[in-house]
């Protein structure tokens, strides 16, 4: 499978399960950061479509008051992840680099996929040139997310009762890892690259707009 086919599958998972999509988008963000001819244009595209997606995002996930105003969609999260990679590459002072990365990770608290997406991005950046490290990165991501789900569920379900939820949260990450590690051929689609490039940006605000309008129509 080429990169664009896997991204199309990730778009489909966005409609049913965001977790697999989080991993896939973070993985290809790291890959795209290394391939892009202009990091400034890459960041600009993320920012532009993040702004376009914000109103549809608030239609789908309405929150009142300050909480609603300070909640941003996942493209803003990916922009923060991009800035994490930029800080890692461009800032030479070890202390300043760590400070900026930690600040960006905590800034994601105000976005969808808070905290986890930047951490996943750092994992994949660490694993970028090593197949063994990629296996480790997906394993750590599954344990990390599954562990968080277990801690959340055990309060009401107990330690054993929370295990099905834990496995349910970890499995999409492992499935995502399987597709990328064993089926991905490291290439982009041979044809219609321009279409795929812009479709992946436009899909997110587009599908949110449709869901938001449906919500307004059905619930008022």
Where are these regions (language model features)?
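Alpha-helical transmembrane segments and their immediate juxtamembrane cytosolic regions
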Residues: 1-220
């Amino acid at each position: 499978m080429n990169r664009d086919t896997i991204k199309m599958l990730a778009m489909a998972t966005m409609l049913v399960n965001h977790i697999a999509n989080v991993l896939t988008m973070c993985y290809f963000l790291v890959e795209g950061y290394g391939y892009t001819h202009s990091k400034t244009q890459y960041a600009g595209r993320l920012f532009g479509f993040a702004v376009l997606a914000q109103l549809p995002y608030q239609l789908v996930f309405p929150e009142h008051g300050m909480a609603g105003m300070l909640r941003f969609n996942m493209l803003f999260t990916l922009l923060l992840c991009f800035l994490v990679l930029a800080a890692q590459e461009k800032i030479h002072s070890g202390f300043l680099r760590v400070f900026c990365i930690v600040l960006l990770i905590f800034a994601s608290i105000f976005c969808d996929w808070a905290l986890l997406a930047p951490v996943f991005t750092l994992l994949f950046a660490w694993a970028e040139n090593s197949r063994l490290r990629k296996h480790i990165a997906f394993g750590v991501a599954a344990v990390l997310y599954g562990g968080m789900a277990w801690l959340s569920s055990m309060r009401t379900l107990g330690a054993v009762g929370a295990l099905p939820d834990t496995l349910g949260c970890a499995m999409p990450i492992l499935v995502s890892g399987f597709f990328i590690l064993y089926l991905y051929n490291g290439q982009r689609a041979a044809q219609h690259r321009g279409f795929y490039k812009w479709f992946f940006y436009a899909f997110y605000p587009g599908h949110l707009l449709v869901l938001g309008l449906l919500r307004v129509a059905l619930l008022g």
